[in-house]
């Protein structure tokens, strides 16, 4: 049976999460969907036993494989590597740390039957970020989301849990996509030739963002700087270099707003 669905998981030192992610993903699918699905880990040469872990799961009958990169690093380029090598026409990206529930993946694929691009959103009624998420992470996430608002109508453009129909990626010049940015979903939302009709362009699937169970968070000051640089490039791409002043003004207003909110949180 031909592959119709591909799940891409960028990974670095995530050996302990590979087995639970794989088993939960396929257990959450109907038998029919599972037969048409492949799982691809894109690993940046972790050398932590991830390759052996994936091979063991493949020998157990799971349709899973691993791509090991030795000359490249970075989340966005890893996602793109997996997308371009995927066999399916419906693609989903998710984190390896189980903060994106594998059981929700079938809902993203179902949404992709009706939409060009689908996002898992943490900002729908009744769901959201786990209550144990630190306040500073919530503030950073909300601020980043607000700064991306002029670029897309999506409620959660910062989500790393998303999917797309591969044909839209194939219709975009790879040179136009910044593979060094941190938020690849936002990059693709801004640059792919998605339908003009928002009803078919973007779908959203609510999910609750969980707490990492194994490994360490990749969030750092360097990542935040990369995101700000990516935002600048996307603003220029969408609005033109002459309107860069709008980006700077928006940044400044948002900066003072966040400082105000943090002041009241602390004092």
Curated annotation (Swiss-Prot):
Changing residue 141 to A: Reduces specific activity 2-fold. Binds 1 divalent metal cation. Gene3D superfamilies: Spore Coat Polysaccharide Biosynthesis Protein SpsA, Chain A. InterPro entries: DPM1-like, Glyco_trans_2-like, Nucleotide-diphossugar_trans. GO terms for cellular component: cell periphery; endoplasmic reticulum; endoplasmic reticulum membrane; mitochondrial outer membrane; mitochondrion; nuclear outer membrane-endoplasmic reticulum membrane network. Induction: Repressed by aspirin. GO terms for biological process: dolichol phosphate mannose biosynthetic process; dolichol-linked oligosaccharide biosynthetic process; GPI anchor biosynthetic process; protein O-linked mannosylation. The keyword Nucleus does not apply. Its cofactor is Mg(2+); Mn(2+); Ca(2+). Pathway: Protein modification; protein glycosylation. The chain crosses the membrane at residues 239-259. Mg(2+) binds at residues 97, 99. The modification N-acetylserine is found at residue 2. Present with 1885 molecules/cell in log phase SD medium. This is Dolichol-phosphate mannosyltransferase. The lineage of its organism: Eukaryota, Fungi, Dikarya, Ascomycota, Saccharomycotina.
């Amino acid at each position: 049976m031909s592959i119709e669905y591909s799940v891409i998981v960028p990974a670095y030192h995530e050996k302990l999460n590979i087995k639970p992610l794989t088993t939960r993903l396929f257990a959450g699918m109907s038998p029919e969907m599972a037969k048409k699905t492949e799982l691809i880990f894109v690993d940046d040469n972790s050398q932590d036993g991830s390759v052996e872990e994936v091979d063991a799961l493949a020998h157990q009958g799971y349709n899973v494989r691993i791509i090991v990169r030795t000359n490249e690093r970075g989340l966005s380029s890893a996602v793109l590597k997996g997308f371009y090598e995927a066999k399916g026409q419906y693609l989903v990206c998710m984190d390896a740390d189980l903060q994106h529930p594998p059981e929700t993946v079938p809902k993203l694929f179902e949404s992709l039957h009706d939409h060009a691009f689908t996002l898992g959103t943490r900002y729908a009624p009744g769901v959201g970020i786990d209550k144990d998420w630190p306040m500073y992470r919530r503030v950073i996430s909300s601020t980043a989301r607000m700064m991306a608002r002029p670029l897309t109508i999506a409620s959660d453009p910062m989500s790393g849990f998303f999917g797309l129909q591969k044909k839209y990626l194939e219709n975009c010049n790879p040179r136009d996509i910044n593979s060094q940015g941190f938020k690849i979903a936002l990059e693709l939302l801004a640059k792919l030739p998605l339908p003009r009709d928002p009803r078919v362009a973007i779908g959203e699937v609510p999910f609750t963002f969980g707490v990492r169970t194994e490994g360490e968070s990749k969030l750092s000051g360097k990542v935040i700087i990369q995101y700000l640089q990516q935002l600048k490039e996307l603003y220029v791409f969408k609005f033109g270099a002459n309107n860069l002043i709008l980006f700077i003004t928006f940044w400044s207003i948002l900066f003072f707003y966040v400082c105000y909110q943090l002041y009241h949180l602390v004092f």
